[in-house]
Amino acid sequence: MAEINRDDVAHLAQLAHIDMSESELDRMAGELAVIVDSVKSVSEIAGDDAPATSHPIPLSNVLREDTVGHVLSQEQVLSGAPDAEDGRFKVPAILEED
């Protein structure tokens, strides 16, 4: 893979319509070179015998049994509400009606 230089960064910035100063172009060329080197290192280590994975460790959900616990009655729930109507919480309107 070819090295990324300042001219490559300037070209990419132009294609992406990103204005970059001279110092930003120089700094970005160095940062992208480090990234390319890192990708090269990983590419050299990963062989054809390594299976493709989406995550480095297996994913598994930890689930608990869905059991019914203590349930409050509707009256108990609404007893702490500042206002209730027809068995529901009553809140101030926030949208205008047409």
Curated annotation (Swiss-Prot):
EC number: 6.3.5.-
Record function comment: Allows the formation of correctly charged Asn-tRNA(Asn) or Gln-tRNA(Gln) through the transamidation of misacylated Asp-tRNA(Asn) or Glu-tRNA(Gln) in organisms which lack either or both of asparaginyl-tRNA or glutaminyl-tRNA synthetases. The reaction takes place in the presence of glutamine and ATP through an activated phospho-Asp-tRNA(Asn) or phospho-Glu-tRNA(Gln).
Region (Disordered): 76-98
Key word Signal present: no
Subunit architecture: Heterotrimer of A, B and C subunits.
Pfam families on file: GatC
Catalytic activity: L-glutamyl-tRNA(Gln) + L-glutamine + ATP + H2O = L-glutaminyl-tRNA(Gln) + L-glutamate + ADP + phosphate + H(+); L-aspartyl-tRNA(Asn) + L-glutamine + ATP + H2O = L-asparaginyl-tRNA(Asn) + L-glutamate + ADP + phosphate + 2 H(+)
Organism: Renibacterium salmoninarum (strain ATCC 33209 / DSM 20767 / JCM 11484 / NBRC 15589 / NCIMB 2235)
Family, per entry: Belongs to the GatC family.
UniProt xrefs under PANTHER family: GLUTAMYL-TRNA(GLN) AMIDOTRANSFERASE SUBUNIT C, MITOCHONDRIAL
Protein known as: Aspartyl/glutamyl-tRNA(Asn/Gln) amidotransferase subunit C
GO terms under biological process: glutaminyl-tRNAGln biosynthesis via transamidation; regulation of translational fidelity; translation
Keyword match Cell inner membrane: no
GO molecular function: asparaginyl-tRNA synthase (glutamine-hydrolyzing) activity; ATP binding; glutaminyl-tRNA synthase (glutamine-hydrolyzing) activity
Enzyme class: ligase
Keywords for this protein: ATP-binding, Ligase, Nucleotide-binding, Protein biosynthesis
